Amino acid sequence: MKKNYISALAVLACVAVFCTISGNSFHQMRTATEEIIPGEGVTEVRMLSDYFPDLAGTAGDTQIYVLQGEQEGGSCLILGGTHANELGGHMGAVLFVENAKVEAGTLYVIPRTNNSAFTHNDPQEGHPSTVHITTDEGNVREFIHGSRATNPVDQWPDPDVYVNYMGQSLSGSEN
């Protein structure tokens, strides 16, 4: 009987170690951010919660980079990172933040529009969690490669099946 307790404790200890290691990995992804270096054209950095206070402190809150021209003019909004696994939109917005200069009007840039999607990825699809880019100066920059969808932790409970207005049954994560 004593052998069973020892075996059970050994298995329990192994499970606890595994859970701690994997939990730490998930926590690091959930709190990770990449470095975005605002260029000289950025006149202000705001948060989306400045416009909708209920977002403050949630994964939906994200930075808005404002580039104000010296002359009056129109306004333009650039949304990057709508799908965090599509690097083109995110990287395009980052390039604007780091390099653009506005002469007239105002440019608003949100590199991480779906901020929650950057807090997880699709591991069963073989996606990396980060992408590394070497700059001309030889520095390596790291960017997060997230998921197309919002993190399930931020939208739970999500229905298993959703029936749309036409009566079609869809996976709860696809609506």
Specify the residue positions occupied by each region the protein language model found.
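Structured catalytic-domain cores with a bias toward divalent-metal coordination
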Residues: 2-175
